UniProtKB/Swiss-Prot annotation:
This is Non-structural protein 3b. Its main location: host cell. It holds the Pfam family Corona_NS3b. The chain crosses the membrane at residues 46-66, 75-95, 101-121. It is a multi-pass membrane protein.
């Protein structure tokens, strides 16, 4: 794929040299005619050179920066990057496409070295695997951390009464208050559960933050849904009456 994008970047130079070599043994009038044609060919090829080279650089940059939250996809992309950096890049250079091979190898290698720094500091290979500089760790399980608006650090995880989903993994627990999240990389923070929001379908949204949650408000619901929520809360409220025959002061 990379070779297909790069194969035409220097081909106009080969065409130019071929035309120049063939015009040496041609009559003066024919030579002028061939030179005019050569100039038109080289000019047309030169106009196409910059868009092709720009697309090639953008593609390699996209490949170096692309990230996914799916574990299997990340493994496949990482293997393709390693093959491109160690095999395709040198192969392009060996076949004479020096710019193509150098750009491919250099961009991917610089990105790998940059991520390897976070791998070395935090001793976790997931920085290279997920192609990101910030990860969140939930009881040893790593997942990409998506920075929220205004650079505030908080995490919301979806789950149930005794489990929550961490990326494509399921974390089971006894008490949600015992679950903590460690943010490592460009950001450094330790988060705990500050609120467990119960949804109408019985699922939960767990909010992790450094600041306590004061309250959660219902909004954007129809009156019928609000009435159903109030009815559910009334059913769950239990009032225990003390029998008159029991002496509470004893």
């Amino acid at each position: 794929m990379i070779g297909g994008l790069f194969l035409n970047t220097l081909s106009f130079v080969i065409v130019s040299n071929h035309v120049v070599n063939n015009t040496a043994n041609v009559h003066h009038i024919q030579q002028e005619h061939v030179i005019v044609q050569q100039t038109q060919i080289v000019s047309a090829r030169t106009q196409n050179y910059y868009p092709e080279f720009s697309i090639a650089v953008l593609f390699v940059s996209f490949l170096a920066l692309y990230r996914s939250t799916n574990f299997k996809t990340c493994v496949g992309i990482l293997m393709f990057k390693i093959v491109s950096m160690t095999l395709i890049g040198p192969m392009l250079t060996a076949y004479g496409y020096y710019i193509d091979g150098i750009v491919t190898t250099t961009v991917l290698a610089l990105r790998f070295i940059y991520l390897s720094y976070f791998w070395y500091v935090n001793n976790r290979f997931e920085f290279v695997l997920y192609n990101t500089t910030t990860l969140m760790f939930v009881h040893g399980r790593a997942a990409p951390f998506m920075r929220s608006s205004h650079s505030s650090i908080y995490v919301t995880l979806y789950g149930g009464i005794n489990y929550m989903f961490v990326n494509d993994l399921t974390l089971h627990f006894v008490d949600p208050m015992l679950v903590s999240i460690a943010i490592r990389g460009l950001a450094h923070a330790d988060l705990t559960v500050v609120r467990a929001v119960e949804l109408l379908n019985g699922d939960f949204i767990y909010v992790f933050s450094q600041e306590p949650v004061v309250g959660v408000y219902n909004a954007a619901f129809s009156q019928a849904v609000l009435n159903e929520i109030d009815l559910k809360e009334e059913v769950e409220d239990h009032v225990y009456d003390v029998p008159s025959g029991i002496n509470c002061h004893r």
